């Protein structure tokens, strides 16, 4: 039987826009998602899980079920409704109250400054493609670092990679642009500059606590490891989703291999990446200052060589087999592999998490420590009305197998200090609405009642014994 360390964090993850609701309440400014959902979907993030009002219940459940850490994000537009300028005191008060309740319940808050929710005013002006947004973000970060002294763990961004991908490659995030690789890389780079500036400011000003970043790191494999085209496709996919942002985080520059891949993709698809020389100094100054890396991991992908046009079909319905992903000059994802997958065509491959952790350890030895900041199974949960619970054995099995490879990585020298299941309770899903559930606690979105799932009881026993069984 495998065990986890005594000081290991057994956490649950949330995000402001996916959990809080109250999207227009108490002075909160609009974000691009408000309009985008209203215009394109049959659902909105109102009231989501009503965490804005229900957080005392969720934190009480956390304490009761052994969850000793919680990922929370601050809604930038709840603090600065326009992203800059006048502060909203009710937003500040809300987060003080929330963090106070976390500590009262002995649940350590790991607080993210940006989780997919740039204020609408800045988003409509180019988001992070506009370099002014970098400076506005740093000012917002400085305000939070100074205001919320009760926070011990800060994360600048959640998933810089999927933000650029969602906005400019897949087109499922506002502004809904597809296949614009130049914007993808420019967004990634500019956000990494914003991260580096915020981290340097945190350390220069001597704030207490720790600061890091959360990256989504889906592992990429060649479908046929003996086929050079498949190997190259996996390398290029890895550069887009992982290596570009990891290089910026820990090398303070982009390796020759990374830039060759970027230039190849841009030469095939058009566009250019603009990196002022000053940016390299900013990245270099911060590369050793990250106290931790958060890794979000759900799946791996298998890549084939491909010489056609870009075409992505996003499976938002949970009808298995509805996905297509092929990129001009990069490769195509092969879904017909002997690996289980979710209804949303996400490949379930725990070894991919082990390989990704050990890749960070090997290639970026200045990583310091790792938290697995998101991992979990999206499922069409069947609520048992009589017993008021969900028998989510598939979720337990998924989490168990990923925790086992985390234990293996620790054994093999990786400094992994905690795990945050996505998600603490059921929350709103960006491109799936309310059907796709991840939580330990089932949320009846009509009544906002919470009900522990079978996985919550399993997680409680795990947190108490540290034994994976």
From Swiss-Prot:
It catalyses: a 6-phospho-beta-D-galactoside + H2O = D-galactose 6-phosphate + an alcohol. InterPro entries: 6P-beta-galactosidase (IPR005928), Glyco_hydro_1 (IPR001360), Glyco_hydro_1_AS (IPR018120), Glyco_hydro_1_N_CS (IPR033132), Glycoside_hydrolase_SF (IPR017853). Gene3D superfamilies: Glycosidases. GO terms for cellular component: cytosol. Its EC number is 3.2.1.85. GO terms for biological process: lactose catabolic process via tagatose-6-phosphate. The active site is at residues 159, 374. Keywords: Glycosidase, Hydrolase. It comes from the Bacteria. Pathway: Carbohydrate metabolism; lactose degradation; D-galactose 6-phosphate and beta-D-glucose from lactose 6-phosphate: step 1/1. One of its GO terms (molecular function) is 6-phospho-beta-galactosidase activity. D-galactose 6-phosphate binds at residues 18, 115, 158-159, 296, 429-430, 436, 438. Transmembrane segments: none annotated. PANTHER family: GLYCOSYL HYDROLASE, LP05116P. Belongs to the glycosyl hydrolase 1 family. HAMAP family: LacG. This is 6-phospho-beta-galactosidase. It comes from Staphylococcus haemolyticus (strain JCSC1435). The gene is lacG.
């Amino acid at each position: 039987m495998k065990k986890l360390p005594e000081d290991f964090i057994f956490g649950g993850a949330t995000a402001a826009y996916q959990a809080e609701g109250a999207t227009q309440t108490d002075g909160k400014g609009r974000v691009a998602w408000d309009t985008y959902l209203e215009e394109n979907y049959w659902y909105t993030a109102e009231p989501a899980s009503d965490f804005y009002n229900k957080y005392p219940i969720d934190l009480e459940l956390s304490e009761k079920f052994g969850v000793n850490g919680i990922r929370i994000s601050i809604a930038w537009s709840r603090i600065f409704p326009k992203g800059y300028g006048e502060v909203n005191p009710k937003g500040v008060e809300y987060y003080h109250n929330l963090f106070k309740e976390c500590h009262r319940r002995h649940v350590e808050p790991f607080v993210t400054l940006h989780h997919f929710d740039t204020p609408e005013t800045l988003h409509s002006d180019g988001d992070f493609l506009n370099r002014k947004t970098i400076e506005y973000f740093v000012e917002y970060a400085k305000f939070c670092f100074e205001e919320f002294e009760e926070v011990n763990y800060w994360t600048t961004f959640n998933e810089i990679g999927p933000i650029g991908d969602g906005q400019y490659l897949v087109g499922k995030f506002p502004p809904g642009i597809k296949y614009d690789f130049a914007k993808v890389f420019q967004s990634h780079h500019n956000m990494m500059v914003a991260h580096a500036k915020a981290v340097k400011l945190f350390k220069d000003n001597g704030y207490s606590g720790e600061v890091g970043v959360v990256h989504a790191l889906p592992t990429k494999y060649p479908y046929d490891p003996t086929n050079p085209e498949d190997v190259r496709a996996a390398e290029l996919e890895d550069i887009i989703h992982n290596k570009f942002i990891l290089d910026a985080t820990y090398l303070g520059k982009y390796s020759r291999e990374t830039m060759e891949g970027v230039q190849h993709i841009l030469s095939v698809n058009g566009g250019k990446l603009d990196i002022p020389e000053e940016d390299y100094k900013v990245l270099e100054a911060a590369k050793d200052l990250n106290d931790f890396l958060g890794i979000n991991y759900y799946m791996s992908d298998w890549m084939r060589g491909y010489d056609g046009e870009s075409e992505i079909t996003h499976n938002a319905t949970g009808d298995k087999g509805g996905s297509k992903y092929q990129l001009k000059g990069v490769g195509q994802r092969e879904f017909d592999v002997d690996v289980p997958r979710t209804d949303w065509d996400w490949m379930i491959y725990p070894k991919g998490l082990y390989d990704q952790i050990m890749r960070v350890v090997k290639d970026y030895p200045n990583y310091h420590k790792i938290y697995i900041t998101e991992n979990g199974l999206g499922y069409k949960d069947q609520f048992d009305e009589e017993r008021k619970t969900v028998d989510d054995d598939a979720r337990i099995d998924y989490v168990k197998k990923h925790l086992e490879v985390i234990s293996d990585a620790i054994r093999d020298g990786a400094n992994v200090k905690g795990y945050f299941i996505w998600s603490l309770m059921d929350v709103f899903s960006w491109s799936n609405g309310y059907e796709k559930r991840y939580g330990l606690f089932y949320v009846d979105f009509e009544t906002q009642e919470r009900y522990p799932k079978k996985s919550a009881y399993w997680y409680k026993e795990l947190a108490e014994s540290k034994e994976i069984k």
